[in-house]
Each structure stands twice: as C-alpha cells, then as structure tokens.
C-alpha cells in the first residue's frame, strides 16, 4: 500500500469504536519520510512567496534543492539498503521499506519538477530586474571574446576530455559531481564514440558576462560555457548529442561498535563514503535517450533512479547567485544585538552571570557573547578548568581557538569532539588533532551514542572556593549558522545546574552513569521519562478539572511513545500546541484522537532550531508556575534513545517569562510565516483572520529586546504582553 492509499483510508472516526481502532492502528502515525517531503514542500513554497525579495526567493529554492540532495544521500539510501537486503519490517505507520521507497520516488519526482518550474519563473523575474542567466545559444560575439579568454585561462587546464572505450573505462563520478556526456563523430571517417568531461567542482559555476551596455548582471553556467568549446577539447570531432548529468551517492556512514581507534575508523569510513552507491541520477532533458541509457548502464542506475530535468541541474548551487551585489533584492541586512546585561558589567560575563541568569536568543542576539564567555575563561587567571562539547563548528572556529589558548595558558581543558556529526566528520577529526596539539584533553564520547548536547563549563577560583559557570545551548557552537538559526543560549552560575553539567561531562568522558540528576535530565537515560512524566501529570490535572496545557517547540516529532502520550493527553482534555519545523508523525485535529492538538510549522527568514518544552503544571499556559525546559533534543527515537542530549529547566523568573511569554507566545501567534499541519500530514499557510493583526515572529524578535538580556538602559522597553488566550 502506498502512502496516498494509506492516507485515503484514514477517515474521521464516527464513534468510540472507530476512535479506538484508529488509536491502535499504525495509521495513527504519518510516515516520517512523507512528512519530511511535506516540510521541504513548505520550503519550496517560500520560494514562491512574493512577500520575499527576489534573491531571497532564489535562496529558498536553493535550500529546498540542497535539502532534497541530503535526504537522498541518507534516508533514501537507507531504504534502498533495506530493500536490497529483503527487509519487510514496516515502519510505525505500517509501510514496508519498498512501499515507502515507491512513494518517496514519486513524490520526489514531482518536487523536482516543481522546483524547475519555479526556477523558470524566477529566471524570468530576475531578468526583469537585471540579473540574467544566458544560454549558450544566446551568447554574443562580445561574450565569446570574454568566454574564450576565461576558458583558456581558468577552465581548460583543469578539464580532462575522456573517450569511453575498452582502453578508457568509464571514470568514477563523485557524489554531487557534474559531467558532460557526449556522442561524437570523427569527421575523417564518420566513426562514432562516446566521451565524457568531468566538470570540476572547484571552478566557479556561474561566469560573469559583459553587461552589453545595459547595466545588467549577466551570467552563464560553467557547463554551458564548456559546451561552447567542445572543439577545443575534441578537435576533429563533431558533436552528435550531448547532455549534462549529475549523481547523488549513498553518504551514510556505517561504524562498527567494536573499534580500537575511533579516529582511524572514521577516516577509513569517510574514504569509503566517497564511493557510495549511486542512488539518484539527474540528466538534462536535452540529452539523447541513447546517451542517457549508456550513462545509466555505466553507473549501474535503475530506471526509477533516473530523474530527467527540464531545466538547470544542481539548483542548490544557485546560492552562489544570491551573493551578487543587489541588496535591493535581499532581506534588509540585520545586525544582531549584543546583550546589554553584559555591557552593564563592563563586558565581564562572569560578573553578569553571577548576578542573574541570562538567556541569549540567537540570531537576534549575537553569538559573540558565547565566544566572549570562552575567551574570558581562557584568559582569566582565576579560571582553572574548562569543559566543552563540540558537535559542529565553523571552519575558522573562535571556539576552538579559545580552547587552545586556555590549554596553552596551563588550564585544564577537556573537549568532547563528536566524530559522528553527519557531513562534519572530517572537520571534527581535524579540530580534534589541532586541540590535542595545543594540550587539550580530547575525548570522543561513545561509539554507540552520538553526543548532541550543547554544554560549556568554566570552573573559577573565587576566594577560598570554586565557582562554576555554565552555558547550556539548544544549538551548535557555530558562529556562522548562529546568524541564521534560531537558538537559545542559557548562562547560569546556579550550583545545582552546574553540578548536573559536571556529572554529564563525567558520563561522557568516563562512562559514569549520572543516574537521576538534581535538575536537568539527560538522554538516553532520563530525558524521555521526564517528558512522559510531565505529560502524565497534565493528564491527571485535566481529569481533576484543573487547567492542563502543553506547549512543544522542536524540529521533529517522531517518537511513537511520545506521540501516543500526547494522544492520551488530548483525549483527557489537555490543550496541546506544537511548533514543529520539520517532520511531524502525529496526526492533529482528529476528533476523539487528537482534537485538542494543534500543530504548526514556521518557515521564514531564519531557520527555527530551538527546542522548548512547557507544561502548565495545573495552572495552564502561560503561567509563572509552569514547568519550562530548553533542550538540545528533538522528539525522535534517535535523540531520546541513541544520543546524549540535555534537558535544562528554566526557573529564574525573568528567563522563565522570556521563554514562555515572549518566545513561545510569539511563535504561537505568528500568522505570516506559519503553516497549519493537517491530519493527512500536508499543510496549509496560516493567514490572519478577519480583523486579526498580521504578526511576524521573526520581525518581532528583530525589533524587541529580550527580557533577560536587555540591561538597565532598556528596562522601560519591555515588550507588550503578546498572549491572547484562545
């Protein structure tokens, strides 16, 4: 049964028996892969949102294409492996791997077609404002002069024209690699041959052309330019047919749990990943069928793995065009605020944190405060020890530099570097070696568990005692992504939280199971039970006639046990509001099953990434008595059962109000970049009701200071209460 058929059978229950049947059926869940495709459809819809500047629409198109590539490299590759091994075990929603794969490929084909359709519209619109992508047949004589020089100086030296015959076998095409396939005829005797030109990844994709006196920004793609100079590469041959193709390979890593040297094991696995099986081939629609079939045979690709594209391949690379100097076609530049609370204390992070907990809301507030915290720790002679987790960071990481500086200054520095951070494995191996050379004690955590928690800890001698300052985050220690991801950075000197963080580090470095922590919770041992207990408490409050409410904000909601607990809560009368950016396997709004559950997704200028979990505790939401957590964990089995994740309570009244009444409420009432998730897993854009004011959460956060970071100078500019009880 395919997903469409499965969805068609999910009817609104007519009575108690039907509700019970659905509650016990696999169809109470939405397939996670299909839900992800719905999410990427929302991203593509933003490329069609005329409220965004044109180049921002192009950016969303690029993001949706890049997302789809990664989805194939990991999720589709995994399903293909299961099908190949004959796995018939259904997913929680009841679909076998082969059923999921068939549905995914059909949906992906439509998505790719729609991406290309949107590109054609954007191409026309961009040309109208002076950004023109020129086809090879449209180049002028003046263009050819420029291109000839560029080709000879910058492209020709790195190309290798390759005839395909027994002496010249079909070459290896790397993941996401471009190639130009050719059918050639020797002019001397009419003899035909197939040939290939691998298009180098390190050469710029879009070549600037003269403006021809129009002032326009004119470009041609690298593959189109190479096509103009085939005679330079194959003199004496005529082109009978040609076309560009691109491959996507299996890029998931398989790591043995028994390993003597984890770094060497990963280095070997990374080399093997480069040669992963081809799981998708994109071919230019202009490529003759005979030539396309030849390439497919050489790559070992089946018909259902070939996607014929009537447009431009690798739309993800249009992110390069977004960088052109046309600020009028982009979002207005935004400069993140630095928390005034830190400035009030002369830039002394420790003094500001010691006075009161601080929550920094990225990207609206600068990630520089996290860097400054670590730099101050590195340079403060009273700091004796620093501990840090690193999951992802930037190529020129100030975090790594601060840790190295601290170690070189003689401090005890421990860094947990997670080698299993997907697509950042090589960078993390490099960082680990750099840190070790500086004297940092580097550990790699668990082979079987991925350490995803975001923790930093500085131990400082103050008088006769040691004080511990900690940072608990929802996002990575990555200064670049911190400019576009919405995340939370919590700073505290609370000794209870500090002791919990120390025990979590001991768990990671020494396998010392932390047991029940005093305030925080950690997966895979205590985080999920903590959340389930809170859901159970809300159910009891509802049954007792007290206010009962749950607010969740995360990237994905997949875990069956959590979903079933939320269904039970809905049936008991608990009001559940979920802000889920991506995958949501829960079916909201079904009478008797989930009628009290609402799910929305926000897709906008910034990538929603923070995780927040709120429980009314018998007082409803929002309430100063509510239980509020921030977390590194999404509600997925991998996060809750197979990763080291953290759940941190927020008890400081100001920070509590900031998270609950400011951040969560703003996300809940957003009606400009929000989508309502429907029972079948699809979504519809939320628009203001008649008489309702438009409200954009991202714009609100850009223009309003946070409660805990605003400082004395902004004390009188507290944001108005946003909450309207529904």
From Swiss-Prot:
One biological process term in Gene Ontology: polyphosphate biosynthetic process
Residues reported in the UniProt entry to bind ATP: 67, 485, 581, 609
Cofactor(s) named in the record: Mg(2+)
Enzyme class, UniProt record, top EC level: transferase
Region (Disordered): 704-726
Residues holding Mg(2+): 392, 422
Keyword Transferase among record annotations: yes
PTM characteristics: An intermediate of this reaction is the autophosphorylated ppk in which a phosphate is covalently linked to a histidine residue through a N-P bond.
KW Kinase (keyword) present: yes
Catalytic activity, as annotated: [phosphate](n) + ATP = [phosphate](n+1) + ADP
GO cellular component: polyphosphate kinase complex
Active site annotation, chain numbering: 452
NCBIfam families for the chain: poly_P_kin (TIGR03705), PRK05443.1-1 (NF003917), PRK05443.1-2 (NF003918), PRK05443.1-4 (NF003919), PRK05443.2-2 (NF003921)
Family under the similarity heading: Belongs to the polyphosphate kinase 1 (PPK1) family.
Function: Catalyzes the reversible transfer of the terminal phosphate of ATP to form a long-chain polyphosphate (polyP).
Protein name according to UniProt: Polyphosphate kinase
Natural source organism: Xanthobacter autotrophicus (strain ATCC BAA-1158 / Py2)
């Amino acid at each position: 049964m395919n997903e469409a058929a499965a969805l068609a059978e999910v009817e609104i229950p007519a009575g108690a028996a039907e509700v019970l049947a659905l509650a016990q059926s696999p169809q109470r869940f939405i397939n996670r892969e299909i839900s992800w495709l719905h999410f990427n459809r929302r991203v593509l819809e933003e490329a069609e949102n005329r409220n965004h500047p044109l180049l921002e629409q192009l950016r969303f198109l690029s993001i949706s294409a890049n997302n789809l590539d990664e989805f194939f490299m990991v999720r589709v590759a995994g399903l293909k492996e299961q099908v190949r091994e004959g796995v018939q075990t259904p997913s929680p929603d009841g679909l076998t791997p082969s059923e999921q794969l068939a549905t995914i490929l059909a949906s992906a084909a439509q998505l790719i077609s729609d991406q290309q359709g949107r590109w054609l519209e954007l191409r026309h619109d961009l040309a109208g404002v002076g950004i023109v992508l020129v086809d090879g047949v449209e180049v002028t004589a003046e263009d050819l002069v420029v291109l000839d020089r560029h080709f000879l100086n910058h492209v020709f030296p790195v190309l290798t024209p390759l005839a395909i015959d027994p002496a010249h076998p079909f070459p290896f095409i790397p993941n996401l690699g471009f190639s130009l396939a050719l059918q050639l005829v020797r002019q001397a005797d009419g003899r035909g041959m197939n040939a290939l030109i691998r298009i180098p990844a390190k050469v710029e994709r879009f070549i600037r052309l003269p403006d021809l006196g129009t002032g326009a920004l004119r470009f041609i793609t690298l593959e189109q330019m190479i096509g103009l100079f085939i005679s330079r590469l194959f003199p004496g041959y005529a082109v009978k047919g040609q076309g560009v193709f691109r491959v996507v390979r299996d890029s998931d890593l398989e790591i043995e749990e028994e390993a003597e040297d984890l770094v060497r094991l990963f280095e070997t696995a990374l080399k093997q990943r480069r040669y992963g099986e081809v799981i998708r081939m994109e071919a230019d629609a202009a490529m003759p069928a005979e030539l396309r079939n030849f390439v497919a045979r050489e790559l070992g690709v089946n018909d259902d793995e070939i996607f014929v594209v009537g447009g431009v391949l690798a739309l993800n690379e249009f992110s390069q065009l977004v960088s052109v100097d046309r600020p009028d076609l982009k979002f207005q530049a935004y400069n993140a605020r630095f928390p005034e609370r830190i400035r009030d204390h002369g830039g002394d992070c420790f003094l500001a944190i010691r006075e009161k907990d601080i929550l920094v809301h990225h990207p609206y507030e600068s990630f520089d405060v996290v860097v400054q915290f670590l730099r101050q720790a590195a340079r403060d002679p009273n700091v004796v020890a620093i501990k840090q987790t690193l999951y992802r960071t930037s190529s020129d990481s100030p975090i790594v530099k601060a840790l190295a500086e601290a170690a070189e200054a003689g401090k005890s520095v421990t860094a947990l570097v997670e080698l299993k951070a997907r697509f950042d494995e090589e960078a993390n191996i490099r960082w680990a070696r750099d840190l070790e050379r500086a004297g940092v004690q580097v550990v790699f955590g668990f082979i079987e568990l991925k350490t995803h928690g975001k923790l930093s800890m500085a131990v400082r001698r103050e008088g006769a005692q040691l004080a511990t300052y900690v940072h608990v985050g929802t996002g990575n220690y990555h200064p670049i992504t911190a400019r576009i991801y919405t995340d939370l950075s919590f700073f505290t000197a609370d000794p209870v939280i500090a002791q919990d963080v120390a025990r979590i580090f001991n768990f990671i470095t020494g396998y010392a199971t932390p047991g029940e922590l005093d305030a925080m919770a950690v997966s895979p041992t205590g985080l999920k039970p903590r959340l389930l207990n809170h859901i159970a408490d809300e159910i009891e409050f509802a049954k007792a006639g007290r206010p009962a409410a749950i607010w969740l904000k995360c990237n994905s909601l997949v875990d069956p046990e959590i979903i079933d607990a939320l269904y039970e809560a809905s049936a008991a009368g608990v009001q559940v509001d979920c802000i889920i950016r991506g995958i949501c396997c829960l079916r909201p709004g079904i009478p008797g099953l989930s009628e009290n559950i609402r799910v929305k997704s926000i897709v906008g200028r910034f990538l929603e990434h923070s995780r927040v979990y709120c429980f009314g505790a018998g007082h409803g939401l929002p309430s100063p008595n509510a239980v509020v957590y921030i977390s590194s964990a999404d509600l997925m089995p991998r996060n809750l059962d197979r990763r080291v994740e953290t759940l941190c309570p927020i008890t400081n009244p100001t920070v509590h109000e900031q998270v609950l009444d400011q951040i969560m409420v703003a996300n809940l009432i957003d009606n400009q970049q929000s989508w309502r998730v429907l029972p079948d897993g699809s979504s519809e854009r939320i628009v203001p009701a008649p008489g309702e004011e438009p409200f954009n959460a991202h714009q609100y956060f850009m223009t309003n200071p946070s409660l805990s970071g605003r400082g004395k100078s902004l004390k009188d500019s507290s944001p108005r209460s946003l909450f309207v009880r529904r």
